[in-house]
From Swiss-Prot:
Zn(2+) binds at residues 77, 93, 100. GO terms for biological process: L-histidine biosynthetic process. Keywords: Amino-acid biosynthesis, Cytoplasm, Histidine biosynthesis, Hydrolase, Magnesium, Metal-binding, Zinc. SUPFAM superfamilies: HisI-like. Its cofactor is Mg(2+); Zn(2+). InterPro entries: PRA-CH, PRib_AMP_CycHydrolase_dom, PRib_AMP_CycHydrolase_sf. Catalyzes the hydrolysis of the adenine ring of phosphoribosyl-AMP. Pathway: Amino-acid biosynthesis; L-histidine biosynthesis; L-histidine from 5-phospho-alpha-D-ribose 1-diphosphate: step 3/9. HAMAP family: HisI. The gene is hisI. This is Phosphoribosyl-AMP cyclohydrolase. GO terms for cellular component: cytoplasm. Homodimer. Belongs to the PRA-CH family.
Length: 121
């Protein structure tokens, strides 16, 4: 395993993390991880991230049930970004869409809504 000390966390101790569907390759979300989130992810096999707005560790799907089972972690060539190859339960986006990338640049909805946030949160 790569020594986590060799990863390039930013000045706030964070590293960018992309969640990607293990089967289809679809990009589902972008978030940040601190070292603790990465360690918890490795330890449990369930994606954990760092919430910049709440300033706390969060287990993806903890309140919604829409967890991310991690199959593989990939580190980029600069050691400053991570891809999590995951199986997504339910939707990845808190707005109800399967992917957080559900709009194109024109503002058109191009993604699939898979749950109603009012029923979950």
């Amino acid at each position: 395993m790569i020594d986590l000390d060799t990863l390039k966390f930013d000045g706030n101790g964070l590293i960018g993390a992309i969640a990607q569907d293990n089967r289809t390759g679809e990009v589902l979300m972008f978030a940040f991880m601190n070292r603790e989130a990465l360690e918890k992810t490795i330890e449990t096999g369930i994606a954990h991230y760092w919430s910049r707005s709440r300033q706390k560790l969060w287990k993806k799907g903890e309140s919604s049930g829409h967890m991310q089972k991690v199959h593989e972690l990939l580190i980029d060539c600069d050691m400053d970004a991570i891809i999590l190859k995951i199986s997504q339960e339910g939707g990845a986006c808190h707005t109800g869409y399967r992917s957080c990338f559900y709009r194109n640049i024109e503002g058109d909805v191009v993604g699939e809504k898979v749950f109603d946030p009012a029923d979950v949160y």
